[in-house]
Amino acid sequence: MKRIFDGMTSFSTERPKTTIAIILVFIFSLTPNAMFINFDNSEDAFFPDNETVRLLNEVEDEYQASIDFIRFIDDIDSGDLYKASTWEQLATLEAILLENQDLQEYQYPLFGIQPNSGMASAAIQWHNLQDPVTAESWISELQLAIDAVAASDNESLTGNLANLSAASSSIPSPSLVSATDLRNWRPEDPNLWLDRIDEEANLSSNLSVLSAGLTNLIQGPNSSEIAMVTGPISGKIGMLIGMQSIDYRSMMISNLPAEDSTEPWDSNGPVLTTFVVVTEPGEHGVEVIGDVQEKVSEWAEDLASQAKSETGDSEISVFSFSQLATGQNANLGKELGILNSLCLLLLGFILWTKFRSKRDTANVLVLTVFAILATYGMAGLLTLLGVKMVFNAAMNSIPILLLAIGVDYGLHVVARIREELQDQEKADPQGRGTLRDFSIEARRIAIRKGTILTSAALMVAIFTDMVGFLSFRFSSQQFLVSFGTVIAIGLFFIYLLSITALPALMMIIPPKKLPLEKSGKNDIGPVSSWIGSLVNVPQKVIVVTILISVPMFLGFQQLEVGFDTRDNFDDSVPVVQDFLLIADEFQSSPSPLYAVLDGDVISQEGRALYDSVVMELSDNPKTTGLPIGIWSVLEESRTTNSELDALMNGLSDDESSWSALETWLLTEEGRNISSGNLNSDASQTVISFQAATLDWQATADFESDLSANLADIADESDGDFIVQLSGRSLILAQVTADVADSAVISTGTVAAVILLMLVGINTVRQKDVIRGAARGFVTWIPLMVVVVWVYGIMGLTGYQLNSQTVTIGALTLGLGVDYAVHLTTRLEEEVEHAPSADPVVWSTKSVATTGRAMFGAALTTAGGFSVLNFSSLVPLQLFGQVFVVAIILALVSSLFVLPAMYTPFLKQDAQKYLANTESE
């Protein structure tokens, strides 16, 4: 393998223009494939493959639960709910939602049989169906008509029955509140009817009296004639009796902040008015969810403009999760562009201070950018070929990471080439005072030799890194799988361009007329001498390392997972502010949570289990609003469907009555009602509910406790049932809880792979398994020390693991092995050049040359990652800060710890070289 890459380097120095042409054709043919990359900034991209996710996919596929909530947010002052004008404005907002044709086309009946939920519609329903004051006139009129029929003789019966029939026309029929109803509503003084709602006033007693009166009418003579009139009236009364159990007060309160539930009418808002739409791409005739989100965002903006125009209230806002996705992504895209530009500028400045040459600086930066383009192109090509690769929020740092590492590699190559030029002049003085004074052939020799020598270390480091990062593909976390693959591809392209395109450019472009002594400082200074002298006291180095590692290990034990969903959002974006408001004030999850019941759902036992589950959900203090399931939908739907009402009334201990209902629910008419909550063979139903899910730890605890309670309820039921929980917010909490495991697994996997690679490479080079294993293990130990230090500092300083920093251990190992291989390779070179010298000389010379290059590389890498501190996203800020610390610690470990531990092997090499020399 080394011969192949060395041959590529030689070819690039012999035919540089051809090399550049080949590379440009390759990159420009590969880059367009980036269009095939699957960008998914939704939470799905973080989901693992487990039972909870599969259950969620089953629910969403069966019940078409890919939805969005479009919400008016209306700010009010305390006491405003006692004003009729406030209720009229809320009615206007809800009417605007119902009148919108786009919303109507894609409505999703999440709230029973309707897609909307608002305080105004709930209040109108209560007035129409439960308010004793509103019903007083028609109840009195109907009671008088019933009494008249009861007192009728044969002559007056016909007339009184006609009056009874006429009076029954005033009985309100349960129906959905329309936009017209909302616009025409003129509420009376809320101070009066809100008190009646609080007193749970309804028509139950009045309706019972009316029902009894109607029943008595058909007990006497002329019963058949009377029954023809009273039958339909009794049906209407029966429906109303069923409607008295609906808790309209809770429906209204669910649109207020959770903390106002005890004194709702004194709430200072805001008030939500909601409409639910389907966001399944197929329903909208598009292929990706992003197109749907853009469409929904446009609707939301139009609704906001209309609401402000009609109400004159400029503080009304509209929120949807589609707006959150598009707004946050647009802002994130701008931010990443700025951060990448800052990174380029900063790295360019740092490189210029090291190179003192704009052309060399430009060479390294441009080639690194080309390597990144090739990386994204290859990722797109792999996606096109069927490899599952999803770019998500956790991969936002990849361009900066590749920029920093690419500059790192380029710096090593250029520094080594300049060192070779200096050595040429020292070995054969010709008065060449600047870099330009060297002949083309002399430059070719220096460029080829310097690149090949650097390539030897880079190749070991790069392939160790690649195998380590590719080991992420064994992770259950999809974002880690994609992250590791893309990083591995990027590192390979950076290495490839560093050993081909970079030397080719340095051959084509004449070097700057830079004095040779300023082109690279390789003189041994006091710092290099002191670091080199540490090889004489390896015991002291090891003891100090252990003493430092002990508190770090204790800090490691204190490291916690601290992933808060809000950290992934830029709260300077208005739509993000609305999202956080809804999450905090209303304790509402971004999408519904589901209790999934499997078994004979439409049965007496199934109904009993359903009621127990609903009671458990309703009594849980962490849930908000009313749970909605198949039986609540049926209870609401029966008021407008006489056939369903008859089937519901006929339910008894007889199994055939339940079978009849199940059969009807699976008909086309029945599926129009039940499809949102009952699967196609009535063996599963879902109960949707809301809960506070922004805090991942609280959500994980909530899910664990509630799952256990629901499992107990299922076990105690009379039938064979299973009750499970699912929902996007619950899965995100699980993913977050798995972050700690992922950190351990990813770090452990990469550590094991790096150890195997180091052992394997050294075994091949030493042609001895034991010696190779020993060298590989000793090189590996300082890397693990760095990991302990990094995690220890994170624990001691309060840094927490999140979706970004979960990879810090693996990245630290990847960067650390680069430094370790560079230094050990240089140490072995120095031994080969001067086997009779003292170990201090080998170490000092290596630190003064390669060590300086490593310091410069660490400076550029740290500089590149430091720009992440300018991000508005906390995870990216933390990632940048922690990685800067990791870089510094990796450099310290390589320079101070590794030489002292590696010296015994260097002495063995020196003895071997001396023995070979004597034998010759």
Predicted features and spans:
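Membrane-embedded transmembrane helical bundles of large multi-pass transporters/channels
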Residues: 1-44, 54, 144, 188, ...
